[in-house]
C-alpha cells in the first residue's frame, strides 16, 4: 500500500512539475501591423517594434517603428514613419539601426528622426541587424546569402557565400557572428528547406555549424540565453526553440506561423515575440531558471 501511495504521489508531482514547466503568456498587444522585430532601449525603458505594414520587400513608404512600454502599452504607434518594409532592429548608444529592404537606416533614438540611410546596392532583402562591441554593424541579406557590414562609414558586402543558407537572425559573440539561417529560397514547385545555426569567424570568415548543424526550421529571431545556448524562433513552423552549443534543439513554445525577431529579458526570464501574421507582440515567461548571461547589443 505504501508503495502504491508513493507511486501515485510521484505521478502527481511529475504532472505538477510538467504543468509548471509550460511557458506562460504574460501579455499580448494587438493593433500592430506585421511586426517583425523588437528591441529594448534601457536608457528610456521603452520597446521599439518594426512594422512592415504592407507587402514584404516593397518600397511603398508604409513601414513604421512603434514605441511601447515594457508591459506592451503602445506609447506611439507610428513613432517613426517613412520606412518601406522595416525588419531587423539593433540599438547602439542612441542610434537605432533598421534593416529596410536595400537600405540600412539610422534613427536618432532621442528624437525619432532618421539621420542616415546607407544604400546596399545589389541587395534584395536586408533582414536582421547586429552590432559588435567596436560599433561595427552587420546586416543579413537572406535571399542573396550575403552579410553586409557598416564600418567607418562604409556599407558594403562583407561575406557572400551560399553556405550561409539564407542568413536571417544575427548575433555577435566575441570573435564569432552567430547566424540563424532561414534556408535557401526554393525554386518554383520546390519545398522550402530547413536550416540551423552557423558560426562565422569575424577574423577569417570561416563558416561552421553550431554543434552538429542539423536543420531545425526556417529560423528568424536569435537571442542569447546562456553561454553557448540560444533562443531561436522558427518563422514558418511557428515555434520558439532552445538550441545549445551541440546543436540540440528543444521546442519551448508552439506558436502560430510568423514568429519573428524576438528579444529576451534575463532579469524576468521573459521573451517578447513579434507575431508578424497575427499583428501582435506576445510576452512569455519561460519556466526554466533564468541563467546569468550578458544581453546582446542587438
Which ranges hold each PLM region?
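Bacterial N-terminal signal peptides
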Residues: 6-15
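Asp-box/WD-like beta-propeller blade repeats and closely related beta-sheet repeat scaffolds
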Residues: 23-26, 103-144
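A short beta-strand motif characteristic of beta-propeller blades
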Residues: 24-29, 73-80, 113-119, 154-160, ...
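Beta-rich, blade/repeat-based domains predominating
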Residues: 32-44, 55, 61-62, 80-96, ...
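Short glycine/acidic-enriched loop and turn motifs that connect beta-strands
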Residues: 53-57, 103, 144-145, 184-188, ...
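A short loop-to-beta-strand structural motif that recurs across blades of beta-propeller domains
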Residues: 61-66, 103-105, 146-149, 196-198, ...
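Short loop/turn segments that connect beta-strands within beta-propeller blades
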Residues: 68-73, 108-113, 150-154, 201-205, ...
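Blade-level signature of beta-propeller repeat domains, shared across WD40, Kelch, NHL, RCC1
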Residues: 259-297
